[in-house]
Amino acid sequence: MGLRASGTGFVVLVLLQSCAAYKLICYYTSWSQYREGDGSCFPDAIDPFLCTHIIYSFANISNNEIDTWEWNDVTLYDTLNTLKNRNPKLKTLLSVGGWNFGPERFSKIASKTQSRRTFIKSVPPFLRTHGFDGLDLAWLYPGRRDKRHLTGLVKEMKAEFAREAQAGTERLLLSAAVSAGKIAIDRGYDIAQISRHLDFISLLTYDFHGAWRQTVGHHSPLFRGQEDASSDRFSNADYAVSYMLRLGAPANKLVMGIPTFGRSFTLASSKTDVGAPISGPGIPGRFTKEKGILAYYEICDFLHGATTHRFRDQQVPYATKGNQWVAYDDQESVKNKARYLKNRQLAGAMVWALDLDDFRGTFCGQNLTFPLTSAVKDVLAEV
């Protein structure tokens, strides 16, 4: 019995160590509260044990200081951080910037010593006041002239966090969201330098394809497709990860993005294969109400009566129904991605976003909340 008890304890220890070895970074978006009916998501819907880190998106910058964006952000901050009462190991970060913020605003702040200093000084007290463990910089698509300013911002922010922690508090975490497109990486990021000062980098390995391309294609392929044009050879997660590592990002700081949303297209002809022409983005989802984008829970509804396919080379699924063509991820594809990042010895996975997964567990017929995020977690926990 003694040997069996000891063995069981060892297995449990290995499982805990295995799960703890990988980060599962999960974004939550504050605007998801405004979706109608069952699409409305608040932080109290989140399982506190699902992710290792939850990032609240987004904070604003007003008068060069970090600030709230939504009218009820402070209430939502408190609701999110209350999750740590149930799971004290959970880390929460506040993301500043995002798509609607605009790279020009970041550029204006970071390029001037005084405004940059004002912003940096405002961050630690704001995070401490609202119970966050760190900051996520979502300066998306910085320009060529912004490269050194972003590096300086990251370096000085990390130094400020270190100084603030000298009072005896745990140092605040610092992360950044980085585009996975080769052109965007080359133009705006000194990967080797910013990696030195960041605790982790969330690589946005999705949105490689969209309605702006005039043809159908998958937005989050794991690998290059055999039928991809030479211009698309960089547009996959495998290339983006390899390129980031080649540029000097440490594997133990690189987190690979996995989307819980799909991209939809309206076909312009009866053709449905790769490269088929489109007339524009797909019709809006019932809850997200944005052309060309569908939450996973909306995709589950779409799949009723649809024809499903899988790109074997890219290892991702798509579905067609009428004149609608939808690229998405399912449990099989996200598990493959999680196994891939483990094989590459990356720091973990990032999910965009919890509120786009089937967070209620009522849409996808699996009787499981957050089925995609849970599938990623299960693979990360495998020995």
Curated annotation (Swiss-Prot):
Residues 1-21 form the signal peptide. Keywords: Antimicrobial, Apoptosis, Cytoplasm, Disulfide bond, Endoplasmic reticulum, Glycoprotein, Inflammatory response, Lectin, Secreted, Signal. SUPFAM superfamilies: (Trans)glycosidases, Chitinase insertion domain. Residues 22-383 form the GH18 domain. Chitin binds at E70, W71, G97, G98, W99, N100, Y141, L204, T205, Y206, D207, R263, W352. InterPro entries: Chitinase_II/V-like_cat, Chitinase_insertion_sf, Glyco_hydro18_cat, Glycoside_hydrolase_SF, Glycosyl_Hydrlase_18. One of its GO terms (biological process) is positive regulation of phosphatidylinositol 3-kinase/protein kinase B signal transduction. One of its GO terms (molecular function) is carbohydrate binding. Glycans are attached at N60, N367. Transmembrane segments: none annotated. The keyword Membrane does not apply. Belongs to the glycosyl hydrolase 18 family. Monomer. Carbohydrate-binding lectin with a preference for chitin. Has no chitinase activity. May play a role in tissue remodeling and in the capacity of cells to respond to and cope with changes in their environment. Plays a role in T-helper cell type 2 (Th2) inflammatory response and IL-13-induced inflammation, regulating allergen sensitization, inflammatory cell apoptosis, dendritic cell accumulation and M2 macrophage differentiation. Facilitates invasion of pathogenic enteric bacteria into colonic mucosa and lymphoid organs. This is Chitinase-3-like protein 1. The lineage of its organism: Eukaryota, Metazoa, Chordata, Craniata, Vertebrata.
